[in-house]
Design a protein with these regions (language model features):
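Membrane-interfacial helix-loop-helix
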Residues: 1-18, 117, 152-156, 236
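Juxtamembrane loop-helix boundary motifs flanking transmembrane segments in multi-pass membrane proteins
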Residues: 2, 6, 35, 65, ...
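Detector for Asparagine
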Residues: 4, 54, 108-109, 212
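Short amphipathic alpha-helical coupling elements at transmembrane boundaries
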Residues: 1-2, 28-35, 119-126, 156
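Membrane-interfacial helix-loop connectors
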Residues: 16-77, 150-224
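Selected transmembrane alpha-helices and immediately adjacent juxtamembrane segments
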Residues: 73-169, 226-247
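Hydrophobic alpha-helical transmembrane segments in multi-pass integral membrane proteins
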Residues: 180, 185, 200, 237-248
């Protein structure tokens, strides 16, 4: 990674285009990248765009909105802007690593191939049990909220330009949808909500939802996670209001 913080954030942001992935699995990847020396602010920039601007998600968005590129461009541009802003802010606020556990075993590249393959399998199992419990817990809470909080209640209060974006962001957080599928849900709200609020839904959900919040809390220090969530929330909300004001 470049030593310049701005170039580092910029590079990490666009790396998300090359690695198709879901927000469910992006946190462990970022944890390992930071453990190998990637600056935390660059890791977060990658974490924010990885589940959004990769080809699989963009194609799903294209199909969900009737083979239209408009929402693909809105979603991509806003996600990139949010990731860059958040990454730069974090680079000034946090100088040291923010991992809860920064111990990573040293890798010996001289071992036999069979041993290396065994280590890969062992590592995969360890990561599954390390982060899987938080994924399951987050999914359980999301399911409970979906069961007891009626979606119609949120939709009823989300008709104004300010409240609609907030409601759709809240809905994205609660539903905790996979980024490959959320566009199909968002498209069903086209007749009810503005384009700006739909963009907020499509950008905010993959960045912050119940599942990945628990995984972030298990991986990073609490203060760092709070700053990330608050900053992402404010920037996404402001971006959606700007889209609304410009009449896009």
């Amino acid at each position: 990674m470049p030593k310049n913080r701005f170039l580092s954030v910029l590079l990490a942001t666009f790396l998300g285009m090359l690695f198709p992935g879901c927000e469910c699995g992006i946190v462990p990847i970022v944890r390992r990248l930071i453990g190998k020396g990637v600056p935390p602010y660059a890791g977060i920039a990658f974490m924010l765009t990885g589940p959004i601007i990769n080809p699989v998600v963009l194609f799903a968005t294209y199909v969900a909105f009737g083979s239209s590129m408009h929402m693909v461009w809105y979603r991509s541009i806003v996600a990139i802007i949010v990731a860059i802003i958040v990454g730069i802010i974090l680079s000034f606020m946090f100088k040291e690593h923010q991992l809860r556990d920064d111990h990573f075993p040293e890798v010996n590249n001289k071992r036999p191939l069979r041993k290396k393959m065994w280590d890969v399998c062992t590592h995969a199992v360890e990561e599954f049990f390390s982060m899987g419990k938080y994924l399951v817990l987050g999914a359980l809470i999301a399911a409970a909220v979906q069961t007891f909080v009626q979606t119609s209640t949120l939709l009823a209060i989300g008709q104004g330009p300010f409240s609609s974006s907030a409601v759709m962001m809240g809905l994205a957080y609660i539903l905790s949808l996979c980024s490959e599928a959320d566009a199909f849900i968002a498209s069903s709200f086209q007749s009810t909500f503005s384009t700006a609020s739909l963009v907020a839904f499509l950008v905010y959900g993959p960045m912050v939802d119940i599942k990945n919040m628990f995984m972030m809390l298990a991986t990073f220090k609490t203060k760092f996670v709070i700053v990330v969530i608050v900053t992402v929330t404010l920037v996404v909300y402001a971006s959606s209001l700007l889209i609304y004001a410009m009449g896009w």
